[in-house]
Regions:
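Short, Lys/Arg-rich, polar N-terminal cytosolic tail immediately upstream
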Residues: 1-19
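Transmembrane-helix bundle segments that line or gate the permeation/cavity pathway
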Residues: 2, 23-473, 477-483, 518-544, ...
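Ordered core of a single globular domain
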Residues: 402-404, 485-512, 516-522, 574-588, ...
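Extended non-catalytic scaffolding segments
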Residues: 547-568
Length: 600
Protein backbone atom coordinates (compact mmCIF):
# COMPACT_ATOMS: atom_id res chain seq x y z
CA UNK A 1 0.00 0.00 0.00
CA UNK A 2 1.43 3.33 -1.04
CA UNK A 3 1.57 6.12 1.50
CA UNK A 4 0.54 9.54 0.35
CA UNK A 5 3.55 11.65 -0.51
CA UNK A 6 3.90 14.12 2.31
CA UNK A 7 5.38 16.77 0.09
CA UNK A 8 2.35 16.88 -2.18
CA UNK A 9 0.00 17.83 0.59
CA UNK A 10 -0.67 21.45 1.41
CA UNK A 11 -0.19 22.88 4.84
CA UNK A 12 -2.65 21.61 7.40
CA UNK A 13 -3.87 24.24 9.81
CA UNK A 14 -4.79 23.17 13.31
CA UNK A 15 -6.84 25.45 15.46
CA UNK A 16 -4.41 27.00 17.91
CA UNK A 17 -5.16 27.56 21.57
CA UNK A 18 -6.36 30.97 22.61
CA UNK A 19 -3.43 33.37 22.55
CA UNK A 20 -2.09 33.77 26.06
CA UNK A 21 0.01 36.53 27.56
CA UNK A 22 2.79 36.26 30.08
CA UNK A 23 2.98 39.04 32.66
CA UNK A 24 6.19 41.03 32.95
CA UNK A 25 6.50 39.90 36.54
CA UNK A 26 6.54 36.26 35.38
CA UNK A 27 9.15 37.11 32.73
CA UNK A 28 11.35 38.84 35.31
CA UNK A 29 10.99 35.86 37.66
CA UNK A 30 11.94 33.49 34.83
CA UNK A 31 15.06 35.45 33.91
CA UNK A 32 16.06 35.52 37.58
CA UNK A 33 15.72 31.73 37.63
CA UNK A 34 17.83 31.58 34.45
CA UNK A 35 20.64 33.55 36.07
CA UNK A 36 20.50 31.56 39.31
CA UNK A 37 20.33 28.18 37.58
CA UNK A 38 23.21 29.08 35.25
CA UNK A 39 25.47 30.21 38.08
CA UNK A 40 24.72 27.12 40.18
CA UNK A 41 25.07 24.79 37.21
CA UNK A 42 28.34 26.40 36.16
CA UNK A 43 29.87 26.01 39.61
CA UNK A 44 28.64 22.41 39.83
CA UNK A 45 30.00 21.41 36.42
CA UNK A 46 33.45 22.89 37.08
CA UNK A 47 33.97 21.73 40.64
CA UNK A 48 32.14 18.40 40.70
CA UNK A 49 31.36 17.67 37.04
CA UNK A 50 27.70 17.32 37.90
CA UNK A 51 25.94 18.62 34.78
CA UNK A 52 22.60 19.93 36.05
CA UNK A 53 21.24 20.61 32.57
CA UNK A 54 21.94 17.25 30.96
CA UNK A 55 19.12 15.71 28.94
CA UNK A 56 16.30 17.13 26.86
CA UNK A 57 14.24 16.83 30.04
CA UNK A 58 17.00 18.53 32.07
CA UNK A 59 17.72 16.57 35.23
CA UNK A 60 17.57 19.64 37.50
CA UNK A 61 14.93 21.65 35.64
CA UNK A 62 12.16 19.06 36.06
CA UNK A 63 12.32 18.87 39.89
CA UNK A 64 12.71 22.67 40.07
CA UNK A 65 9.64 23.06 37.87
CA UNK A 66 7.69 20.61 40.04
CA UNK A 67 8.65 22.62 43.13
CA UNK A 68 7.45 25.83 41.47
CA UNK A 69 4.16 24.14 40.54
CA UNK A 70 3.59 23.03 44.14
CA UNK A 71 4.46 26.44 45.59
CA UNK A 72 2.22 28.09 43.02
CA UNK A 73 -0.64 25.80 44.10
CA UNK A 74 -0.25 27.07 47.67
CA UNK A 75 -0.16 30.69 46.50
CA UNK A 76 -3.34 30.10 44.50
CA UNK A 77 -5.11 29.00 47.68
CA UNK A 78 -4.06 31.94 49.86
CA UNK A 79 -3.50 34.74 47.33
CA UNK A 80 -4.88 33.86 43.88
CA UNK A 81 -3.97 37.21 42.33
CA UNK A 82 -0.24 36.46 42.77
CA UNK A 83 -0.40 32.93 41.37
CA UNK A 84 1.07 32.03 38.00
CA UNK A 85 -1.21 30.85 35.21
CA UNK A 86 -0.61 27.55 33.45
CA UNK A 87 0.83 29.36 30.44
CA UNK A 88 3.27 31.19 32.69
CA UNK A 89 4.31 27.95 34.35
CA UNK A 90 4.98 26.37 30.97
CA UNK A 91 6.82 29.53 29.89
CA UNK A 92 9.17 29.04 32.85
CA UNK A 93 9.80 25.43 31.82
CA UNK A 94 10.37 26.37 28.17
CA UNK A 95 12.96 28.99 29.01
CA UNK A 96 14.78 26.99 31.69
CA UNK A 97 15.02 23.90 29.51
CA UNK A 98 16.29 25.98 26.57
CA UNK A 99 19.24 27.36 28.55
CA UNK A 100 19.86 24.31 30.75
CA UNK A 101 22.89 23.09 28.81
CA UNK A 102 24.49 26.49 28.12
CA UNK A 103 26.50 26.24 31.34
CA UNK A 104 27.41 22.61 30.66
CA UNK A 105 28.73 20.53 27.77
CA UNK A 106 26.94 22.63 25.20
CA UNK A 107 29.15 25.71 25.63
CA UNK A 108 30.65 26.92 28.90
CA UNK A 109 32.39 23.73 30.03
CA UNK A 110 34.63 23.93 26.96
CA UNK A 111 34.91 27.58 26.03
CA UNK A 112 36.75 29.22 28.94
CA UNK A 113 39.09 26.37 29.82
CA UNK A 114 40.04 25.82 26.20
CA UNK A 115 40.75 29.49 25.53
CA UNK A 116 43.15 29.46 28.47
CA UNK A 117 44.63 26.15 27.35
CA UNK A 118 45.49 27.40 23.85
CA UNK A 119 47.91 29.87 25.45
CA UNK A 120 49.09 27.85 28.45
CA UNK A 121 49.96 24.79 26.37
CA UNK A 122 51.86 26.91 23.85
CA UNK A 123 54.47 27.52 26.55
CA UNK A 124 58.04 26.12 26.34
CA UNK A 125 57.34 23.34 28.85
CA UNK A 126 54.61 21.93 26.59
CA UNK A 127 55.11 19.60 23.65
CA UNK A 128 53.04 22.10 21.64
CA UNK A 129 55.40 25.03 22.20
CA UNK A 130 54.39 27.96 20.01
CA UNK A 131 51.89 25.78 18.09
CA UNK A 132 48.72 27.76 18.81
CA UNK A 133 49.44 31.35 19.85
CA UNK A 134 50.89 32.50 16.48
CA UNK A 135 47.48 31.85 14.94
CA UNK A 136 45.39 33.62 17.62
CA UNK A 137 44.38 37.28 17.30
CA UNK A 138 45.24 38.92 20.66
CA UNK A 139 41.67 40.13 21.23
CA UNK A 140 40.27 36.57 21.22
CA UNK A 141 42.12 35.41 24.35
CA UNK A 142 42.82 37.02 27.75
CA UNK A 143 46.53 37.12 26.93
CA UNK A 144 49.04 35.62 24.49
CA UNK A 145 51.70 35.35 27.19
CA UNK A 146 51.48 32.19 29.28
CA UNK A 147 53.21 34.02 32.17
CA UNK A 148 50.47 36.62 32.31
CA UNK A 149 48.39 36.22 35.53
CA UNK A 150 45.24 35.80 33.42
CA UNK A 151 46.74 32.56 32.07
CA UNK A 152 49.19 31.38 34.72
CA UNK A 153 46.90 31.80 37.73
CA UNK A 154 44.27 29.60 36.11
CA UNK A 155 46.67 26.64 36.25
CA UNK A 156 48.75 27.53 39.29
CA UNK A 157 47.60 28.74 42.69
CA UNK A 158 46.74 32.43 42.69
CA UNK A 159 48.89 34.41 45.18
CA UNK A 160 47.15 35.11 48.46
CA UNK A 161 45.50 38.51 48.49
CA UNK A 162 45.72 38.94 44.71
CA UNK A 163 42.72 40.20 42.78
CA UNK A 164 41.04 37.98 40.23
CA UNK A 165 42.31 38.98 36.75
CA UNK A 166 38.78 39.24 35.38
CA UNK A 167 39.46 42.54 33.60
CA UNK A 168 41.67 40.65 31.13
CA UNK A 169 38.55 38.86 29.92
CA UNK A 170 36.56 41.98 29.02
CA UNK A 171 37.87 42.40 25.48
CA UNK A 172 37.82 38.72 24.39
CA UNK A 173 34.35 38.15 25.82
CA UNK A 174 33.07 41.34 24.18
CA UNK A 175 34.44 40.09 20.85
CA UNK A 176 33.29 36.46 21.21
CA UNK A 177 29.75 37.07 22.52
CA UNK A 178 28.16 38.23 19.21
CA UNK A 179 29.49 35.12 17.50
CA UNK A 180 28.36 32.80 20.28
CA UNK A 181 24.90 34.36 20.43
CA UNK A 182 24.71 34.13 16.64
CA UNK A 183 25.35 30.39 16.77
CA UNK A 184 22.41 29.95 19.15
CA UNK A 185 20.24 32.26 17.04
CA UNK A 186 21.04 30.25 13.91
CA UNK A 187 20.06 27.03 15.70
CA UNK A 188 16.85 28.62 16.97
CA UNK A 189 15.83 30.01 13.57
CA UNK A 190 16.19 26.64 11.83
CA UNK A 191 13.90 25.13 14.47
CA UNK A 192 11.43 27.98 14.06
CA UNK A 193 11.30 27.41 10.30
CA UNK A 194 10.43 23.72 10.63
CA UNK A 195 8.23 23.81 13.74
CA UNK A 196 4.94 24.45 11.93
CA UNK A 197 5.68 21.71 9.40
CA UNK A 198 6.43 19.15 12.09
CA UNK A 199 3.62 20.17 14.44
CA UNK A 200 0.73 20.80 12.07
CA UNK A 201 1.49 18.81 8.93
CA UNK A 202 3.58 15.80 9.93
CA UNK A 203 2.03 15.70 13.41
CA UNK A 204 5.16 14.52 15.22
CA UNK A 205 4.67 13.22 18.75
CA UNK A 206 7.05 15.46 20.74
CA UNK A 207 7.02 12.89 23.57
CA UNK A 208 9.09 14.94 26.02
CA UNK A 209 6.56 17.78 26.05
CA UNK A 210 4.01 15.51 27.72
CA UNK A 211 5.85 15.69 31.05
CA UNK A 212 5.60 19.47 31.64
CA UNK A 213 2.09 19.51 30.15
CA UNK A 214 0.92 16.93 32.70
CA UNK A 215 2.79 18.49 35.62
CA UNK A 216 1.34 21.94 34.91
CA UNK A 217 -2.26 20.77 35.29
CA UNK A 218 -4.98 22.67 33.41
CA UNK A 219 -5.90 26.29 32.77
CA UNK A 220 -8.50 26.15 35.54
CA UNK A 221 -6.26 24.28 38.00
CA UNK A 222 -2.55 24.77 37.24
CA UNK A 223 -1.59 22.03 39.68
CA UNK A 224 -2.15 18.36 38.81
CA UNK A 225 -3.74 17.32 42.12
CA UNK A 226 -5.23 14.25 40.47
CA UNK A 227 -1.72 13.17 39.48
CA UNK A 228 -0.32 13.49 42.99
CA UNK A 229 -3.24 11.51 44.38
CA UNK A 230 -2.58 8.62 42.02
CA UNK A 231 -1.01 5.53 43.61
CA UNK A 232 0.24 4.45 40.18
CA UNK A 233 2.09 7.76 39.80
CA UNK A 234 3.91 7.32 43.11
CA UNK A 235 4.78 3.69 42.37
CA UNK A 236 6.31 4.79 39.08
CA UNK A 237 8.11 7.64 40.82
CA UNK A 238 9.64 5.27 43.38
CA UNK A 239 10.69 2.77 40.71
CA UNK A 240 12.42 5.55 38.78
CA UNK A 241 13.95 7.49 41.66
CA UNK A 242 15.04 4.72 44.03
CA UNK A 243 18.00 3.34 42.00
CA UNK A 244 19.44 6.81 41.48
CA UNK A 245 18.84 7.80 45.09
CA UNK A 246 20.65 4.69 46.32
CA UNK A 247 23.45 5.31 43.82
CA UNK A 248 23.90 8.88 45.06
CA UNK A 249 23.84 7.83 48.71
CA UNK A 250 26.38 5.07 47.99
CA UNK A 251 28.87 7.66 46.73
CA UNK A 252 28.76 9.40 50.12
CA UNK A 253 28.10 6.36 52.31
CA UNK A 254 29.78 3.26 50.79
CA UNK A 255 27.99 0.96 53.24
CA UNK A 256 24.75 1.59 51.33
CA UNK A 257 24.52 -0.93 48.46
CA UNK A 258 25.04 0.37 44.93
CA UNK A 259 22.27 -0.83 42.56
CA UNK A 260 24.50 -0.05 39.54
CA UNK A 261 21.75 0.94 37.09
CA UNK A 262 24.37 1.16 34.31
CA UNK A 263 25.95 -2.25 33.76
CA UNK A 264 27.26 -4.27 30.84
CA UNK A 265 27.15 -7.92 29.90
CA UNK A 266 30.89 -8.45 30.23
CA UNK A 267 32.75 -10.88 27.99
CA UNK A 268 30.31 -13.26 26.31
CA UNK A 269 32.61 -14.59 23.56
CA UNK A 270 36.36 -15.07 24.19
CA UNK A 271 37.45 -14.81 20.56
CA UNK A 272 36.30 -14.56 16.98
CA UNK A 273 33.93 -12.12 15.24
CA UNK A 274 31.27 -12.53 17.92
CA UNK A 275 33.49 -10.60 20.33
CA UNK A 276 31.73 -7.59 18.80
CA UNK A 277 28.82 -8.53 21.06
CA UNK A 278 30.88 -8.40 24.25
CA UNK A 279 30.16 -5.71 26.84
CA UNK A 280 26.60 -5.10 25.72
CA UNK A 281 25.13 -2.07 27.47
CA UNK A 282 22.58 -3.14 30.08
CA UNK A 283 21.59 0.31 31.26
CA UNK A 284 18.46 1.12 33.20
CA UNK A 285 17.10 4.53 32.20
CA UNK A 286 13.65 4.92 33.75
CA UNK A 287 13.07 8.16 31.87
CA UNK A 288 13.43 6.30 28.55
CA UNK A 289 11.20 3.47 29.79
CA UNK A 290 8.47 6.03 30.40
CA UNK A 291 9.07 7.86 27.13
CA UNK A 292 8.96 4.57 25.20
CA UNK A 293 5.26 4.26 26.08
CA UNK A 294 4.65 7.48 24.12
CA UNK A 295 6.50 6.38 20.97
CA UNK A 296 5.16 4.69 17.88
CA UNK A 297 5.94 0.98 17.74
CA UNK A 298 8.31 1.26 14.77
CA UNK A 299 10.37 4.01 16.43
CA UNK A 300 10.57 2.06 19.68
CA UNK A 301 11.56 -1.14 17.86
CA UNK A 302 14.22 0.64 15.81
CA UNK A 303 15.81 2.34 18.82
CA UNK A 304 16.14 -1.09 20.46
CA UNK A 305 17.16 -3.12 17.39
CA UNK A 306 19.77 -1.01 15.62
CA UNK A 307 22.43 -1.21 18.36
CA UNK A 308 22.48 -4.97 17.76
CA UNK A 309 22.63 -4.43 14.01
CA UNK A 310 25.60 -2.11 14.50
CA UNK A 311 27.45 -4.79 16.46
CA UNK A 312 26.47 -7.33 13.84
CA UNK A 313 28.04 -5.13 11.20
CA UNK A 314 31.29 -4.98 13.16
CA UNK A 315 31.18 -8.78 13.55
CA UNK A 316 30.73 -9.17 9.79
CA UNK A 317 33.73 -6.91 9.14
CA UNK A 318 35.82 -9.00 11.54
CA UNK A 319 34.69 -12.20 9.82
CA UNK A 320 35.97 -10.74 6.53
CA UNK A 321 39.36 -10.07 8.10
CA UNK A 322 38.92 -6.35 8.77
CA UNK A 323 40.05 -5.87 12.37
CA UNK A 324 40.76 -2.13 12.21
CA UNK A 325 39.00 1.14 11.43
CA UNK A 326 35.64 0.08 12.88
CA UNK A 327 35.14 3.47 14.55
CA UNK A 328 36.07 5.35 11.36
CA UNK A 329 33.74 3.15 9.30
CA UNK A 330 30.80 3.75 11.63
CA UNK A 331 31.51 7.47 11.98
CA UNK A 332 31.48 8.11 8.25
CA UNK A 333 28.41 5.90 7.98
CA UNK A 334 26.74 8.31 10.41
CA UNK A 335 27.96 11.36 8.49
CA UNK A 336 26.36 10.04 5.30
CA UNK A 337 23.16 9.11 7.13
CA UNK A 338 22.92 12.65 8.53
CA UNK A 339 23.31 14.15 5.07
CA UNK A 340 20.64 11.87 3.60
CA UNK A 341 18.27 12.45 6.52
CA UNK A 342 18.65 16.23 6.26
CA UNK A 343 18.05 16.08 2.50
CA UNK A 344 14.93 13.97 3.04
CA UNK A 345 13.56 16.43 5.59
CA UNK A 346 14.00 19.24 3.08
CA UNK A 347 12.45 17.15 0.29
CA UNK A 348 9.38 16.13 2.29
CA UNK A 349 8.83 19.74 3.33
CA UNK A 350 9.56 21.22 -0.09
CA UNK A 351 6.01 22.48 -0.66
CA UNK A 352 5.95 24.05 2.79
CA UNK A 353 9.37 25.63 2.25
CA UNK A 354 8.25 27.08 -1.10
CA UNK A 355 5.37 28.79 0.66
CA UNK A 356 7.74 30.18 3.27
CA UNK A 357 10.04 31.46 0.52
CA UNK A 358 7.08 33.15 -1.18
CA UNK A 359 6.03 34.70 2.13
CA UNK A 360 9.60 35.87 2.69
CA UNK A 361 9.76 37.55 -0.71
CA UNK A 362 6.44 39.21 0.00
CA UNK A 363 7.73 40.40 3.36
CA UNK A 364 10.84 41.79 1.68
CA UNK A 365 8.66 43.58 -0.84
CA UNK A 366 6.79 45.23 2.02
CA UNK A 367 10.01 46.33 3.63
CA UNK A 368 11.50 47.69 0.40
CA UNK A 369 8.46 49.18 -1.32
CA UNK A 370 6.12 49.68 1.69
CA UNK A 371 3.32 47.97 -0.14
CA UNK A 372 2.41 44.56 -1.50
CA UNK A 373 0.16 43.80 -4.41
CA UNK A 374 -2.88 41.75 -3.48
CA UNK A 375 -5.50 40.02 -5.63
CA UNK A 376 -8.72 38.27 -4.75
CA UNK A 377 -7.30 34.98 -6.01
CA UNK A 378 -4.06 35.21 -4.00
CA UNK A 379 -3.15 31.93 -2.31
CA UNK A 380 -2.98 32.41 1.48
CA UNK A 381 0.60 32.35 2.66
CA UNK A 382 1.86 31.10 6.00
CA UNK A 383 1.97 33.43 8.95
CA UNK A 384 5.04 35.66 8.73
CA UNK A 385 6.74 33.91 11.66
CA UNK A 386 8.51 31.44 9.38
CA UNK A 387 9.35 34.19 6.89
CA UNK A 388 10.96 36.22 9.65
CA UNK A 389 12.84 33.13 10.77
CA UNK A 390 14.16 32.57 7.24
CA UNK A 391 15.28 36.19 7.01
CA UNK A 392 16.85 35.83 10.43
CA UNK A 393 18.70 32.70 9.32
CA UNK A 394 20.11 34.47 6.27
CA UNK A 395 21.06 37.60 8.23
CA UNK A 396 22.71 35.69 11.09
CA UNK A 397 24.54 33.39 8.67
CA UNK A 398 25.93 36.43 6.86
CA UNK A 399 26.88 38.11 10.15
CA UNK A 400 28.71 35.00 11.32
CA UNK A 401 30.64 34.88 8.06
CA UNK A 402 31.57 38.54 8.48
CA UNK A 403 32.75 37.87 12.04
CA UNK A 404 34.83 34.91 10.91
CA UNK A 405 36.39 36.84 8.02
CA UNK A 406 37.13 40.21 9.60
CA UNK A 407 37.39 39.37 13.29
CA UNK A 408 38.77 35.82 13.54
CA UNK A 409 40.52 35.94 10.14
CA UNK A 410 39.26 32.50 9.10
CA UNK A 411 38.77 31.58 5.45
CA UNK A 412 35.15 31.95 4.37
CA UNK A 413 34.95 28.60 2.57
CA UNK A 414 35.74 26.64 5.74
CA UNK A 415 33.43 28.81 7.84
CA UNK A 416 30.56 28.20 5.42
CA UNK A 417 31.18 24.47 5.62
CA UNK A 418 31.30 24.60 9.42
CA UNK A 419 28.02 26.53 9.70
CA UNK A 420 26.27 24.32 7.16
CA UNK A 421 27.40 21.37 9.23
CA UNK A 422 25.78 22.98 12.27
CA UNK A 423 22.50 23.46 10.38
CA UNK A 424 22.49 19.87 9.10
CA UNK A 425 23.33 18.23 12.42
CA UNK A 426 21.06 20.60 14.35
CA UNK A 427 18.12 19.86 12.05
CA UNK A 428 18.57 16.09 12.32
CA UNK A 429 18.98 16.18 16.12
CA UNK A 430 15.85 18.33 16.40
CA UNK A 431 13.95 15.76 14.34
CA UNK A 432 15.21 12.87 16.47
CA UNK A 433 14.13 14.60 19.69
CA UNK A 434 10.76 15.71 18.28
CA UNK A 435 9.88 12.27 16.96
CA UNK A 436 11.67 9.83 19.26
CA UNK A 437 12.08 11.83 22.48
CA UNK A 438 15.59 10.52 23.11
CA UNK A 439 16.67 11.86 26.50
CA UNK A 440 20.36 12.44 25.77
CA UNK A 441 21.59 12.59 22.19
CA UNK A 442 23.94 14.58 19.97
CA UNK A 443 25.71 13.82 16.68
CA UNK A 444 28.16 10.92 17.04
CA UNK A 445 30.78 12.98 15.20
CA UNK A 446 32.17 16.51 15.44
CA UNK A 447 31.66 18.63 12.35
CA UNK A 448 35.07 20.29 12.44
CA UNK A 449 36.88 16.97 12.93
CA UNK A 450 35.11 15.49 9.92
CA UNK A 451 36.27 18.52 7.93
CA UNK A 452 39.85 18.07 9.13
CA UNK A 453 39.77 14.34 8.34
CA UNK A 454 38.36 14.81 4.84
CA UNK A 455 40.42 17.80 3.66
CA UNK A 456 43.56 17.49 5.78
CA UNK A 457 45.84 20.04 7.42
CA UNK A 458 47.70 20.98 4.24
CA UNK A 459 44.55 22.12 2.49
CA UNK A 460 42.85 23.74 5.50
CA UNK A 461 45.94 25.33 7.06
CA UNK A 462 47.15 25.60 10.64
CA UNK A 463 45.48 28.94 11.38
CA UNK A 464 42.10 27.70 10.20
CA UNK A 465 42.42 24.47 12.18
CA UNK A 466 43.12 26.32 15.43
CA UNK A 467 40.40 28.95 14.97
CA UNK A 468 37.73 26.63 13.54
CA UNK A 469 38.20 24.41 16.57
CA UNK A 470 37.77 27.41 18.87
CA UNK A 471 34.67 28.49 16.93
CA UNK A 472 33.24 25.02 17.50
CA UNK A 473 33.12 25.26 21.30
CA UNK A 474 29.46 26.25 21.18
CA UNK A 475 26.93 23.85 19.68
CA UNK A 476 29.22 22.52 16.96
CA UNK A 477 31.10 20.46 19.52
CA UNK A 478 28.59 19.26 22.11
CA UNK A 479 29.08 15.65 23.19
CA UNK A 480 25.85 15.34 25.17
CA UNK A 481 23.04 17.42 23.73
CA UNK A 482 22.41 20.18 21.19
CA UNK A 483 20.32 23.29 21.63
CA UNK A 484 18.03 22.42 18.72
CA UNK A 485 16.61 19.50 20.69
CA UNK A 486 15.67 21.82 23.54
CA UNK A 487 14.41 24.51 21.17
CA UNK A 488 11.93 22.33 19.24
CA UNK A 489 10.39 21.09 22.48
CA UNK A 490 10.08 24.64 23.82
CA UNK A 491 8.50 25.90 20.60
CA UNK A 492 6.00 23.04 20.73
CA UNK A 493 5.11 23.88 24.34
CA UNK A 494 4.64 27.50 23.30
CA UNK A 495 2.18 26.39 20.64
CA UNK A 496 0.30 24.07 23.00
CA UNK A 497 -0.22 26.70 25.68
CA UNK A 498 -1.04 29.53 23.28
CA UNK A 499 2.09 31.65 23.69
CA UNK A 500 3.07 31.47 20.04
CA UNK A 501 6.32 30.38 18.48
CA UNK A 502 7.72 33.83 17.76
CA UNK A 503 7.13 35.03 21.32
CA UNK A 504 8.69 31.87 22.69
CA UNK A 505 11.69 32.15 20.35
CA UNK A 506 12.29 35.79 21.28
CA UNK A 507 12.43 35.08 24.99
CA UNK A 508 14.56 31.97 24.45
CA UNK A 509 17.17 34.12 22.74
CA UNK A 510 17.01 36.70 25.55
CA UNK A 511 17.44 33.93 28.12
CA UNK A 512 20.42 32.49 26.22
CA UNK A 513 22.07 35.91 26.31
CA UNK A 514 21.40 36.22 30.06
CA UNK A 515 22.83 32.73 30.65
CA UNK A 516 25.88 33.54 28.55
CA UNK A 517 26.57 36.75 30.48
CA UNK A 518 26.27 34.87 33.78
CA UNK A 519 28.71 32.26 32.45
CA UNK A 520 31.14 35.04 31.51
CA UNK A 521 31.30 35.98 35.19
CA UNK A 522 30.89 32.59 36.87
CA UNK A 523 33.37 30.45 34.97
CA UNK A 524 36.47 32.67 35.10
CA UNK A 525 35.73 33.40 38.77
CA UNK A 526 35.52 29.71 39.68
CA UNK A 527 38.57 28.81 37.58
CA UNK A 528 40.79 31.40 39.28
CA UNK A 529 39.35 30.78 42.74
CA UNK A 530 40.08 27.04 42.63
CA UNK A 531 42.74 26.73 39.87
CA UNK A 532 42.48 23.99 37.26
CA UNK A 533 44.27 21.24 39.29
CA UNK A 534 41.60 21.57 41.99
CA UNK A 535 38.60 21.44 39.68
CA UNK A 536 36.64 18.30 38.79
CA UNK A 537 38.38 15.34 37.19
CA UNK A 538 37.05 16.33 33.77
CA UNK A 539 37.92 20.03 34.02
CA UNK A 540 41.49 19.19 35.09
CA UNK A 541 42.31 17.61 31.74
CA UNK A 542 39.81 19.26 29.39
CA UNK A 543 42.07 21.99 28.00
CA UNK A 544 45.05 19.61 27.77
CA UNK A 545 43.01 17.08 25.80
CA UNK A 546 41.85 19.84 23.45
CA UNK A 547 45.43 21.05 22.95
CA UNK A 548 46.54 17.49 22.20
CA UNK A 549 43.72 17.05 19.68
CA UNK A 550 44.56 20.26 17.83
CA UNK A 551 48.27 19.49 18.01
CA UNK A 552 47.76 16.09 16.44
CA UNK A 553 45.85 17.62 13.53
CA UNK A 554 48.64 20.20 13.08
CA UNK A 555 51.48 17.68 13.07
CA UNK A 556 50.12 14.47 11.57
CA UNK A 557 48.27 13.53 8.42
CA UNK A 558 45.27 11.24 8.57
CA UNK A 559 44.52 10.12 5.02
CA UNK A 560 41.13 8.63 4.39
CA UNK A 561 41.03 4.90 3.78
CA UNK A 562 38.60 2.68 1.87
CA UNK A 563 37.00 1.97 5.27
CA UNK A 564 35.93 5.62 5.48
CA UNK A 565 34.49 5.69 1.98
CA UNK A 566 32.71 2.35 2.25
CA UNK A 567 31.21 3.51 5.51
CA UNK A 568 29.99 6.66 3.78
CA UNK A 569 28.48 4.74 0.84
CA UNK A 570 26.78 2.10 2.99
CA UNK A 571 25.46 4.73 5.41
CA UNK A 572 23.94 6.82 2.63
CA UNK A 573 22.40 3.81 0.88
CA UNK A 574 20.97 2.31 4.07
CA UNK A 575 19.44 5.57 5.27
CA UNK A 576 17.95 6.28 1.83
CA UNK A 577 16.47 2.78 1.64
CA UNK A 578 14.89 3.06 5.09
CA UNK A 579 13.37 6.44 4.24
CA UNK A 580 12.08 5.15 0.90
CA UNK A 581 10.46 2.12 2.53
CA UNK A 582 8.88 4.31 5.23
CA UNK A 583 7.38 6.64 2.62
CA UNK A 584 6.22 3.78 0.39
CA UNK A 585 4.71 1.31 2.84
CA UNK A 586 2.46 2.22 5.74
CA UNK A 587 3.43 0.18 8.78
CA UNK A 588 6.96 -0.67 7.66
CA UNK A 589 8.45 -1.82 10.99
CA UNK A 590 11.87 -0.10 10.84
CA UNK A 591 12.42 3.63 11.16
CA UNK A 592 15.48 5.53 9.86
CA UNK A 593 15.72 7.37 13.18
CA UNK A 594 16.92 4.12 14.76
CA UNK A 595 19.73 3.96 12.22
CA UNK A 596 20.59 7.65 12.65
CA UNK A 597 20.55 7.54 16.44
CA UNK A 598 22.60 4.46 17.22
CA UNK A 599 25.21 4.18 14.49
CA UNK A 600 28.53 5.85 15.20
Amino acid sequence: MKAQNAAAASLVTISAPTVQKVLWSAIAFTLLLVATFTAASGWSSLTRYEIMGTGYLPRSVVPLFLLIVLINAGIRVFSPSFALSRSELLFIFEILSSIAAVSGQEFANHFYLNLLGLVYYSSPQSQWFNAFTPHLPPYLVPSLNFRDPAILWAYEVMPEGARLPLSEWLVPLFVWTPYLLGIYALSLFICLIFSRQWEEHERLLYPLTQVPMELSGSDERPCPTFLFRSLLFWLGFIAAALPYALRALHLYFPSIPDPQPQRNSGVLFPSGPLTAFNNLELHYYPEMVGIAYLLSSEVGLSLWLFPFIRRGEVAARMAMGMDMYHAEFLTFQSVAAYLVMAASLLWVARGYLKEILAATLRLLAKVVTFFAKRTENSVPLPAPTEAKALLGTIAVFAALLAWAKWVANVDLSWTIMLLLGLLITGLVVARVVAEAGVYIYSPPFRVYQVMFDVFGKNRIGARNIVLLTAMSWAQLRSTATMATGYFVNSLKLGSLCGLGRLTTATWILVAVLVAMIVCHVTFPTVIYSYSVPKLSWWAQTSSLNTANLIGQYLTTSRPLTPHHWWGFIIGAATCWLLIKLRLSFVGFPLHPIGFITWFG
